[in-house]
């Protein structure tokens, strides 16, 4: 799998936290992330929560690739929730009606 800038990914960090973020840039040793959020299990399923409480939420952050244990493209439903949580835009998916 190749990692591409401009796409949203789920990352399991080496210390155990799961992060969802858009990768805006990458090089051989770092990922630059936009609006990273932590995945938190709750009674009604997973929730997305700010992962850096004291940082400017609009600032990009840099993560060392070596601190990422696993990375995968985000699931569509989680990606939709991420988009809504970070921009306020609620994606609309067209449904195919079968009759």
PLM regions and their residue ranges:
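Conserved RNA-binding domains used in RNP assembly and mRNA/RNA metabolism
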Residues: 2-99
